[in-house]
């Protein structure tokens, strides 16, 4: 099975990107001349094939290639000059991928207590983020450098969201060329891990506020609230622009469509990203699901913060009321959208890539429905059913188990 999905060659990349993972072809070419990259690539390929086909021999072989690549990458990172080479960054990105492809058994008698899949994954992501920072902006302006930068961008943002704190990547203040709607989305969402950490620290400090500090604390809370609302409005504008691009492409293809059908929040088949997310290639589909996931996390955190800040103000400044959060800022709709399209990740032609692209949105939606007490809901069940029997779904299921998301299914 191919790792990358079968892309429509007619796509021009203006919406979501021509390739779902443009760094993969560059790494394949690099592997022709670099042994360490080749070892890392073989480790990923054998791990994926081994677990999908239940072939233990391939899995063991994959672990050997992984160990070789890991050792050589570690050696290269000790050299200030060698560490900056594209091949080292490529190896680091493949090691991140391997942690999603490997499968640590959940059986008590076979589980290695020294291994923690999510910790290993986060460690590789964090290290790769620091390497991006060390290499500097100029090394990511070449074609391969840009592809490698793109390859670590989403895992870095996901790691920041999952830990609710910034990492070396999300703290970068680089102005790289903005190529498409996916690039613009990631630029908008990049500050959110820092904002989530600020939310958490604000609430943590609430219990230690003295009488002479309440005004300063409230002012800081209002600043955070306004920052979050600004990002929300920017995300809404991004969605409207993406829908407009979809309409323009449909019109240029000769289809008669009413532009009013592409207005946010009204009824209609193609009035939202849900209606068009499967019409413009796998890259655009993945971008939409990542967008919903980020909105679900940001909107839910914002509403909780708004409630806590208002409660604090009621105690210290009775009568003062915060501005209302817009009705469309709700975590419910993004989670519902993910649930309704989750099966498309395992559609024919999606490749093994889909099992990895699905983990962040599906795990977040599963967690959301479990948290809100709806494990028996159709949305929850539809997501779990799509990867129970699929070969690529097996890898996604195992990684979900490894990061502790699957517990609601087994309780």
Task: Enumerate the language-model features and the residues they cover.
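Fungal-biased detection of long, low-complexity, Ser/Thr-
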Residues: 18-27, 56, 60, 68-82, ...
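Helix-boundary capping/turn motifs
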Residues: 16, 33-43, 61-66, 87-93, ...
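Central/C-terminal regulatory/activation regions of fungal transcription factors
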Residues: 4-12, 105, 111-310, 325-336
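Glycine- and acidic
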Residues: 51-54, 216-217, 319-320
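Acidic, Ser/Thr/Pro-rich intrinsically disordered transcriptional activation regions
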Residues: 1-58, 71, 75-77
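Residue-level recognition of alpha-helical structural elements
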Residues: 58, 84, 117, 217-220, ...
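Hydrophobic/aromatic-rich effector regions of fungal transcription factors
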Residues: 28, 42-55, 66-117, 126-134, ...
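Acidic, Ser/Thr-rich low-complexity linear motifs
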Residues: 102-107, 140-144, 350-352, 399-401
């Amino acid at each position: 099975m191919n790792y990358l999905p079968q892309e429509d060659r007619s796509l021009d990349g203006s919406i979501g990107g021509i390739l779902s993972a443009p760094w993969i072809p560059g790494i394949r070419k690099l592997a022709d001349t670099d042994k360490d990259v080749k070892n890392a690539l073989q480790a990923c390929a054998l791990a994926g094939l081994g677990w999908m086909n239940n072939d233990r021999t391939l899995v063991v072989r994959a672990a050997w290639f992984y160990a070789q690549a890991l050792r050589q990458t570690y050696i290269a990172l000790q050299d200030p000059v060698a560490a900056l080479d594209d091949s080292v960054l490529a190896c680091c990105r493949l090691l991140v991928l391997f942690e999603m492809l490997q499968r640590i058994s959940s059986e008590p008698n076979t589980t290695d207590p020294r291994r923690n899949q999510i910790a290993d994954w986060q460690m590789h992501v964090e290290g790769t983020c620091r390497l991006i920072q060390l290499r500097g902006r100029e090394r990511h302006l070449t074609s391969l450098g840009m592809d490698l930068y793109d390859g670590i961008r989403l895992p870095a943002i996901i790691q920041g969201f999952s830990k609710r704190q910034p990492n070396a990547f999300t703290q970068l203040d680089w102005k790289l060329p903005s190529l498409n709607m996916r690039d613009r989305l990631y630029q908008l969402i990049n500050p959110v891990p820092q904002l989530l950490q600020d939310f958490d620290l604000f609430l943590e400090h609430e219990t230690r506020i003295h009488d002479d500090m309440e005004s300063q604390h409230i002012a800081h809370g209002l600043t955070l609230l306004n920052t979050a609302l600004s990002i929300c409005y920017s995300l809404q504008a991004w969605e409207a622009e993406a829908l407009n691009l979809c309409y323009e492409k449909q019109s240029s293809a000769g289809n008669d469509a009413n532009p009013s059908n592409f207005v946010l929040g009204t009824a209609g088949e193609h009035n939202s990203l849900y209606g068009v997310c499967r019409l413009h290639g796998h890259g655009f589909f993945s971008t939409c699901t990542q967008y919903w996931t980020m909105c679900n996390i940001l909107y839910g955190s914002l509403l909780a913060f708004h409630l806590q800040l208002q409660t604090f103000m009621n105690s210290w400044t009775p009568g003062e009321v915060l501005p209302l959060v817009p009705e469309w800022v709700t975590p419910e709709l993004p989670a519902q959208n993910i649930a309704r399209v989750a099966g498309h990740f395992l559609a024919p032609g999606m490749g093994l890539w889909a099992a990895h692209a699905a983990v962040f949105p599906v795990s977040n939606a599963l967690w959301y429905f479990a948290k809100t007490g709806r494990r028996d809901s159709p949305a929850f069940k539809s997501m779990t059913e799509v990867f129970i029997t699929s070969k690529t779904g097996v890898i996604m299921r195992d990684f979900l188990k490894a990061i502790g998301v699957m517990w609601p299914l087994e309780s």
